[in-house]
From Swiss-Prot:
Annotated region (Disordered), positions in chain: 1-22
GO cellular component term, pick one: plasma membrane
Membrane topology: Multi-pass membrane protein
InterPro entries in alphabetical order: IM_pro_YhjD (IPR005274), Virul_fac_BrkB (IPR017039)
Keywords associated with the record: Cell inner membrane, Cell membrane, Membrane, Transmembrane, Transmembrane helix
Keyword S-adenosyl-L-methionine: no
Recorded coiled-coil stretches: none
Broad class of the protein's primary localization: membrane
Protein name: Uncharacterized protein Dda3937_02003
Amino acid sequence: MPVKPNQPRPSTKQDPSSGASRQRFGYVTGWLHRIRSVPAIAHFIRAGDRFNDRMGNQFGAAITYFSFLSLIPILMVSFATAGFVLASNPDLLTGLINRIVNSISDPSLARTLKNTVNTAVRQRTTVGLTGLLIALYSGVNWIGNLREAIHAQSRDVWERQPHEEEKIYLRYLWDFLSLIGLLLALVITLFLTSVAGSAQATIVRALGLNGIDWLRPVMTLIALSISIFANYLLFLWILWVLPRHNPRRGPLLRGTLMAAIGFEALKFAMTVALPELATSPSGAAFGSVIGLMTFFYFFARLTLFCAAWIATADPKTDINTQAPLPGA
């Protein structure tokens, strides 16, 4: 009978390096747990979870698509307005046509563009009315989609509740009034921003303070504050009036301020990035389209994330009432 060789006994001695690794891992885990337990950071984590669970990225992409699609009838109305202006100023129309002809070396292409301009001027009424009707329809649907996306982030549960159902004509009427309100809010925002920018140099010149160096950053800070205040009014309307719900006042005001500051940062980033895009041939051709789509997408994501942040201000309410996606 063969004798089995002696098997070496497994060593029970622990590797010092593995013990140190576990200690470091435990330290990092505890450190991350302490960071996550900070109320402000925990709030952002809850908002991010709700934003992702309730398809914030997908809703943002849908809002971007509908926003870009709504630009087509707006361009039709713009061309019709230009047609009315050119029709009332024959000299301006003649000068525009001559510039087109002189700037294009290909005679057939110049002739085609000349006929296009003349056709646009002749059909300005038809194009304007058609574009206005399409813009009204697409604008009402756009505001409705934005409202539903904000509702998805703001509801206590994911599914639409029976009491939220409303008649279709009432929904379209409310969306139409909401669209008018949004346009008024945009006009006020643009007015305050433009006044803040133009009045800055006028006030400095009127007071004879051109030579004071430290006044320039102060005036820039004042103009920035006015612009953020205008953004605040716009997002207060979007996050409070548009979805027709009553969140707690504190989270609403703080979330609106966060959206206003983020929107101002987005505008600054776009003013820096768009000139850089225009330097390349492809950027010159598609830069404006890419810039608009990027702006709409980040605007939608910012709006929906702030809506989720406002809705998750109370951790107890969020944990007890948040429901999973249907079929999850």
